[in-house]
Regions:
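Sec-dependent N-terminal signal peptides
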Residues: 1-4
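C-terminal motif of bacterial Sec signal peptides marking the signal peptidase cleavage site
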Residues: 9-11
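Residue-level detector of conserved, function-critical positions
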Residues: 21-360
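Bacterial signal peptide processing site
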Residues: 13-15
Length: 360
């Protein structure tokens, strides 16, 4: 997640990242969600007659549709919406944290971000408010740190709510592999968000600047490398800030399962950690690899390739999300559902009158 101060006198309009059925050509999921994949429960959100519930891996209803919205389970709990308020349920479908918040985010490291009247704090899994609702905005915890925005700027807090990195930044990204991207303006604070944006660098968990602010864009560290932008091209640095894959890509994404998406002349392909082109740029869009498959966009349709670049699930979907615990969410016209790695539908709105919703 990236948090940016837009205007110190106005409330931030950004909301916590939620998983949803992405629009056509939209493949990319946040790196923070990638990190949480191993903590997901094997239940999948579905909808029936305007209410949402859950199916299991086989496509059978596990929790009867009864919620206005239902999110994926993470760390054993899932966000649900009832009568315009948000709370949490367990895998049995029982409400364990009463719907009472205007906004929530998924649990991460035992705490969940919650919002009331455009202010943010954190609760534990009992629903106890462990960090008072006080911040203009915040992010979920990652490696013991959460981004927190105050009227002074953007900094980081620890799980007790203590500011451990002062709010002196204009933008910040979640910690990943011990480092977090930060950005500050030469013009200082306060400032106009439309002035020259200066550069990004990286700090460690103590707030020490370990990679100087020198890049126009940065991504999170993943598998030891981070994509960065210099002079309009993207390459990769290591955790010491050394450029190990030269910046000659129009776009470069995070590494996942040993490969990273890159873009050259409007086409997308994949490189390995040595910078070698493993799958030549040939796709109109592409996603990160998850469970051995990656979504790609060909001639206005989405399908899936394996790590050799072979198309193993025909490009036939209007949108296709990454595989998570053996299933992927796809859409064809009004038909939405989940497929297995063979491309077979496990569940479909066409024959079960179910559909997915976006979180509003």
């Amino acid at each position: 997640m990236v948090i940016m101060v837009l205007n110190l006198t106005a409330s931030c309009s950004l909301k916590p990242n939620q998983a949803s059925l992405l629009p056509e050509k939209a493949f990319f999921a946040s790196s923070s969600f990638q990190k949480q994949r191993q903590e997901l429960v094997g239940l999948y959100p579905i909808q029936l007659n305007g209410k949402m519930g859950y199916m299991d891996f086989t496509g059978q209803v596990a929790i009867a549709p009864q919620f206005d919205y239902a999110d994926r389970f993470v760390e054993g709990l899932a966000q649900v919406k009832i009568n315009n308020k948000w709370g949490f349920i367990n895998p049995a479908g029982s409400i364990v944290i009463k719907p009472q918040f205007d906004e929530t985010d998924r649990f991460s490291e035992g705490l969940a971000l919650v919002g009331i009247k455009d202010r943010w704090g954190f609760i534990d899994k009992t629903g106890k408010l462990t960090i008072p609702i006080q911040f203009d905005f915040a992010s979920k915890f990652s490696q013991g740190r959460a981004i927190a925005m105050t009227k002074k700027g953007v900094g980081f807090i620890d799980p007790t709510g203590k500011l451990v990195i002062e709010p002196t930044y204009f933008e910040a990204k979640d910690f990943s592999e011990g480092l977090a991207g930060v950005r500050i303006l030469k013009t200082g604070f306060p400032y106009d968000c439309c002035v020259d944006p200066n550069f990004w660098g990286f700090v460690d968990r103590s707030g020490k600047e370990v990679i100087p602010l020198q890049f126009r864009l940065v991504d999170d560290f993943s598998e030891g490398l981070a994509a960065v932008s210099i002079d309009g091209k993207m390459g990769y640095i290591d955790q010491k800030g050394k450029m190990v894959i030269e910046p000659h890509f129009d776009y470069a994404g995070s590494f996942s399962e040993g490969l990273a998406i890159i873009k050259i002349k409007e086409k997308w392909g994949y490189i390995n950690r040595k910078g070698k082109m493993v799958i030549e740029p040939q796709f109109d869009n592409a996603s990160y690899f998850s469970e051995g498959l990656a979504g790609v966009y060909i001639d206005r349709k989405s399908g899936y390739i394996d790590p050799t670049g072979r198309l193993v699930i025909k490009a036939q979907f209007d949108s296709a999300l990454p595989f998570i615990q053996g299933l992927a969410e796809v859409r064809v016209g009004d038909r939405e559902g989940y497929i297995d790695p063979s491309g077979k539908y496990v569940w479909s709105s066409q024959n079960k009158k179910f559909s997915r919703l976006r979180k509003k």
